[in-house]
Design a protein with these regions (language model features):
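Conserved class I S-adenosyl-L-methionine
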Residues: 1-40, 51-55, 59, 72-77, 133-160, ...
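Conserved Class I S-adenosyl-L-methionine
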Residues: 2-8, 22, 49-51, 166-258
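Conserved hydrophobic/aromatic "anchor" residues
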Residues: 8-9, 15, 97, 102, ...
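Conserved donor sugar-nucleotide recognition element shared by glycan-biosynthetic enzymes
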Residues: 19, 23-27, 49, 71-74, ...
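Class I SAM-dependent methyltransferase SAM/SAH-binding core
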Residues: 41-95, 104, 119
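A short SAM/SAH-binding and catalytic strip from SAM-dependent methyltransferases
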Residues: 103-117, 140
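A short glycine-rich, Lys/Arg-flanked "PGG" loop and its adjoining helix->strand segment in the class I
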Residues: 118-133
Length: 258
């Protein structure tokens, strides 16, 4: 069973320390790839705790940005973090905005978790004006070293549990997704980020507090399993001593609406 339709759980703070350290630098490069610039109006679908939203607000201003996020907790975080921002607590397949409401509609690190990815892409295209840009990006399979280490725990301690979804995690499948949705001038790219850490605990502690895909449900582990999991995790990272860096690599796609 894959992690289709996943809604992340855990505190927003833990998520930011877990995946936000990757999604924040990714957002800047993704927005560059899309060509986000004033005076555009943009939508962030599956906004999470706001990594991409923050980059869009920085470039366009809060009045020109809207966000869709199905998690009640994360939607509340978005409203607190960006006062006055148009935040709707909805999934990507059910966007409430009218046709042609935006110049650009983006979905960062979400398409693989949707129940209906093709339907969501069509929704992004619908709310984007003709000639506007629709784009998404997703971590490649084994593209995030930290997630590979978590998957090692799953394989060794919980082999019968859910496995991470693998579709829409490469340029070819993303291109096909967009072309079949009727988008034009489809282009793909790969984006790589690097994150610095000082200790293994700096990464492990938020990892065990955040639910969602990419690894085992470590929050339900017994103390003995947690100890085993941490040892496996450290081994998978190469038993680092002192500071170390981990890479993340994403596939990205953009297309023109209408």
């Amino acid at each position: 069973m894959s992690a289709r339709g996943t809604v992340f759980s855990g505190s927003s703070d833990a998520y930011d320390r877990f995946m936000g350290r990757y999604s924040t630098p990714l957002a800047e490069q993704f927005a560059d790839f899309v060509g986000v610039a004033a005076p555009q109006r943009a939508l962030d679908v599956g906004a999470g705790t706001g990594a991409l939203t923050a980059e869009l607000v920085r470039r366009l201003g809060a009045d020109n940005v809207a966000a869709a996020e199905p998690s009640t907790d994360y939607a509340a975080t978005l409203r607190e973090r960006f006062p006055g921002l148009d935040v709707r607590e909805v999934p990507g397949e059910e966007l409430p905005w009218e046709d042609a409401s935006f110049d650009a509609a983006l979905a960062q690190l979400v398409v693989v978790f949707l129940n209906d990815a093709p339907g969501a892409v069509r929704e992004l295209a619908r709310v984007t004006r003709p000639g506007g840009v629709v784009a998404t990006c997703m971590w490649e399979v084994d593209g995030v070293e930290m997630m590979k280490a978590l998957n090692e725990i799953r394989q060794r301690l919980s082999p019968g549990g859910p496995t991470p979804a693998t579709d829409y995690r490469d340029e070819a499948s993303l291109r096909k997704l967009f072309e079949e949705a009727g988008l034009r001038e489809v282009e793909t790219s790969r984006i790589e980020v690097s994150v610095e850490y000082e200790t293994v605990d700096e990464l492990w502690e938020p990892a065990i507090r955040v639910g969602g895909p990419g690894g085992p449900a470590v929050r339900s582990f017994t103390p003995e399993q947690l100890a085993q999991g941490r040892a496996i995790f450290e081994e998978a990272l190469g038993n680092p001593r002192g500071g170390y860096s981990l890479k993340g690599r994403a596939a990205a796609v953009r297309g023109v609406s209408g």
